[in-house]
Amino acid sequence: MLHDARLIVDDIEKLTIKPQQFYVLIDEVRQENKQIKVRLLKEREHFIFPPRFAWLSFDSDSQKYCPGQRWSMQLRLRAVHARLNEGEFDNQRFALANHTPLQGRIMRQDVESSACSWRWQFIKHHEAQIGFLSQQATLKALAFGIRDDLSKTTRQLLRDTGTAHLMAISGMHIALAGGVEWLLARGIQFLLPAHRIGYLFPLIASWILAATYTWLSGGHAPAQRALLALTIWIATRIAGAQLNGWQIWTLCIGLLLITDPLTVLSESFWLSALAVGMLLIWYHWFPLPDRFHQRRWLLLQLLHLQIGMMILMAPLQVTLFNGISVTALVANLIAVPVISFITVPLILLAMMLPFSSASVLTWWCADSTLRGLVYVLTLLPTGWWPLHNASLLALLVWGGLIIWRGQIFFSAPFSCGAIAIAMLLSRQEKIEQGWRIDMLDVGHGLSIVISQGREAILYDTGPRWKTDDAGGRVVIPWLERKQLQLQQIILSHKHLDHSGGLESIKQRWPQIQVRSALNNVEHLSCIRGTQWQWKQLHFQVLWPINASASGNNNDSCVISVDDGKVRLLLTGDIEAIAERQLVALEKHNLNVDIVQVPHHGSRTSSSSLFLRSLNGHAALASVARYNAWRMPAKSVLENYQKTGFNWFDTGQSGQISLSINNGKMRVATLREQLMPRWYHQWFGVKRESR
């Protein structure tokens, strides 16, 4: 793995130095987001091996790309750099695990081959047939591995019922495709003379359909892993080798790690590998009695399987997804047979039928099964149970089963008891004394959490994006992971990079209080002179003088927060004009220890007069590495450092956390200190500032 990591880091450094000419193959198109995923085959005349992938942005709506096309492009590439917060999906690790360490824009392009891939043409042909169906997005996910069109409501339903795994083409789907073809091949053999019947034809036919299904699904990693396992199993049968399940499992894992060491960064790899391992353990340790192996006990066999998966996979689900679905057992007992034995076979049949009318009818039948399934799943009670920071508790499941099955308790009772007590004591989390400041990494925007004990106040809610916002994507998962109860939201001003996540947070906590200077009758006041006490912290509003409906930068609500020993200044997006008035009005209140850098470090803010008035120690800036304005400005950063501030920003460090107790302050950054993994590095060129 170290060798592959070094190679990918070297390639990032080499390919992002300057604009370069590449020969690329288009791998995926997201027309709505104006993005294409390309495989970098050559840099000028030099082949790139192993090939690297990059996501490219394009501007023109008239430009139509399709997978399979080959282009000569001049690209300005840059290293992937994702937001980094506790509790948020690790996009940077995901990008490196999938060999997509680059992103960029197209400067010039010339088409070398305009032909679209057969897969793309096949998908477009069938998309026209299912365009009128209500479950077309789910059908596309099951048939072609395209999950981008799944609605937020559908994703939520799948998560809450523990059935999301059914929408990712993986081991179950590939094995099912192979099994369907094996049955068809065996049926054909009944029509042949006895001397023509052999065991090879069904095996080879099943592998061909499984490989075709893998190709149609886009060749994503879970499908490839399943095909590799099936290939090994078929090869051992043809060769006459006698390998048990554990031997095939270890052989698959070994081959995967040899061919792609970076796959260890993939959550889907661990889910796939451990799911199969858990099944082997379950059937080895807790097998059904022989009398229940007959077909009439199929429902009992399925129940036995689902119980095993629910128990043994619970620790991994809690660790990766911070929760489990308590309705998963019932939901999967319904969904797995429907998807496995009805929906997927109908989809495979629809794709194989040569006549459009028959194909459309079969698609409609598959859609009907999904409509019925969705209806039944919506009748189940909301089943998602958040379990944050419960990894050690989840390990008790595995440890308990091992101790019970191996009868270790009887041979070493004191050791087992000591381990159990130690694990239970580790759950006694100490509530942190003092108070905390956490600047979340929301990209270009702002969101700061001030917390005492198990309660928190939020200053700004982060930005809104095209299809999502920082409230739902960052703030809520972070608060839930930290088990904090949100008491109040303070909006500095109206701009969407500060208020974009408000609606998502209000949907989660409808009764939450909001404070602002926006002339909103539903909001608490946030104008100069307003002050309140929250536990040991005193809040005092220093600016603006009057409320304003416009909510521009200079109308930002500036607040001083202190415990009598350490003072924090929250500034929103005020600029030099407001800074001068603030210094004139509140100079005695500006002697602070910590300042939130105004307006993301723009040159229009952080004037020399303002900085001299602060006399602080830590400056916190919320910025995105690749923001369009190249903030923070180099001159602003240098001025803070010359004035004696220690500079921290989310673009460089991800989430920034400060613990304050009895006048002492400790700063911890996620990228450098809390999660200092090699794949979280700042790759590529140094900071691009103006």
Question: What function would you assign to each model-found segment?
Answer:
Residues 2-165, 469, 473-477, 481-485, ...:
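Membrane-interface helix/helix-cap signal primarily in integral membrane proteins
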Residues 104, 154-329, 386-432, 605-609, ...:
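Hydrophobic alpha-helical transmembrane segments in multi-pass membrane proteins
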Residues 114-130, 138, 146, 154, ...:
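Hydrophobic alpha-helical segments of integral membrane proteins
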Residues 97-228, 235, 532, 539, ...:
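Aromatic-rich juxtamembrane segments at the membrane interface
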Residues 199, 311-312, 333, 341, ...:
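Hydrophobic alpha-helical transmembrane segments of integral membrane proteins
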Residues 61-79, 94, 291-296, 351-690:
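Non-globular, low-confidence helical/coil segments that flank catalytic cores
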